[in-house]
Amino acid sequence: MKLVLVSTRGVRSLNSTNFPAPWPFVKKGAFGQRKIGPMNYEKFKWPGQNREFPELSPKFQKLNPKELHRYTGVQADGFHDEKTGEFVPVKEMRSELVVPNLDGFKLRPYVSYRTDVQIEKRRVAYEKKVLEKGSERLADLHTVEDERWPPPKMSAETLFELAYGDTVRSAYKEGKYGNK
């Protein structure tokens, strides 16, 4: 085996180790997908190298400015006094929510009239199904969930019916749950 002396001073020479192939060729000892072409490794990607973070983050850089020691990305509601070194809160800089008083406001949020028609259709159809089958439980078994109104509340029994109801009923009819 031939050892190659490579400069450690950061100087590039015409040594072949400084000029790797643009992609790994399929050969003995290749790893990953055995193909010819460029390969991207996630382990070599560091956060911030391609400007993923717009803020200057001391986490991924060697410089660690004092201004960013307790940086949270939140606008401060005051300033640091350089003479005393203390934080001075300013009332005008404090963020506040401005919510209008809607007491006595006549308008309501807009909902399309077509929605009301669809809801009414679903309610009437479901009530007919309840009258036809005799109870809400039987009507629920014979109604698609999207056609029910009001929509069903999910209970343990409903979940069991949706997941195992048909198989348990068919197994019971076949006599698999009898005394043996």
From Swiss-Prot:
Record-level GO cellular component terms: mitochondrial large ribosomal subunit; ribonucleoprotein complex
Pfam family, one: MRP-L27
Cellular location(s): Mitochondrion
Keywords in alphabetical order: Mitochondrion, Ribonucleoprotein, Ribosomal protein, Transit peptide
InterPro entries associated with the record: Ribosomal_mL41
Transit peptide location: 1-21
Superkingdom, taxonomy of origin: Eukaryota
Ribosomal protein in keyword set: yes
GO molecular function, one term: structural constituent of ribosome
GO BP: translation
Main location: mitochondrion
Disulfide bonds: none
Assembly: Component of the mitochondrial ribosome large subunit (39S) which comprises a 16S rRNA and about 50 distinct proteins.
Family as reported in the entry's similarity comment: Belongs to the mitochondrion-specific ribosomal protein mL41 family.
Classification via PANTHER family: LARGE RIBOSOMAL SUBUNIT PROTEIN ML41, MITOCHONDRIAL RIBOSOMAL PROTEIN L41
Name the UniProt record assigns to this protein: Large ribosomal subunit protein mL41
Organism annotation: Caenorhabditis elegans
Record lineage: Eukaryota, Metazoa, Ecdysozoa, Nematoda, Chromadorea
